[in-house]
Amino acid sequence: MDKLIEKPHGLVLVTGPTGSGKTTSLYAALNKLYDPRKKIITIEDPVEYELNGINQIPVNPKRGLTFAAGLRSILRQDPDIVFVGEIRDGETADISIRSALTGHLIFSTIHTNDAVSSIGRLVDMGVEPYLVASVLEGVLAQRLGRKICKECKQQVPISNDLSHRLTPEERTMFTAG
C-alpha cells in the first residue's frame, strides 16, 4: 500500500464489506501523505473523521452536492490528491478516471467482493476498459479478521512448509479459539 500511495497520479481503490475499515485505511494513507504544500481534498458521505489540514466536504444530495458534482467542483481547485468516499455510479467513476488521467492522485472505495471484480464494476458503470487500464494503480481488498479472546486462544501447529519460512517469533502467532 505504501508504494501505491506514493504514486504521483492514478487511481487507487479499496474494496470490502461494510465496516471492514476501507475508509480508515484511506484516511491513514491521507495522513501519511499530508504535507502543507499539497492540496488534499475529500468528498465523503458522511465525513467520518476530521483530518487536520485536509479539506473535507460532505455530500448533500438535497442541495445538489453529489459525489459527481462535488468532484467536479474539487477539480476546479487543482488538488494534488482527492479522496472520493465511494464510486457508486458511472458519472462519478468517469470523472474519477479522467481526473487520474490528468495528473491527480485519486483514492476511493468501491463495493465489490474482491479486488479483481473492481475492474468489471468500473466497466459495468460505463468506463472504457482502456481507461481503467491506463489509470488503475492498484486495488486493495480488505476484510477484518476476528480477534480471539485471551481465554480461548490456543496455539496451533503449522505445516513444515510454512514453518521453515517464518521466524521463531512468527511461528507462535498461529492460534485458534
Language-model segments: which ranges?
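Short, flexible helix-loop junctions that flank or precede catalytic/ligand sites
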Residues: 1-177
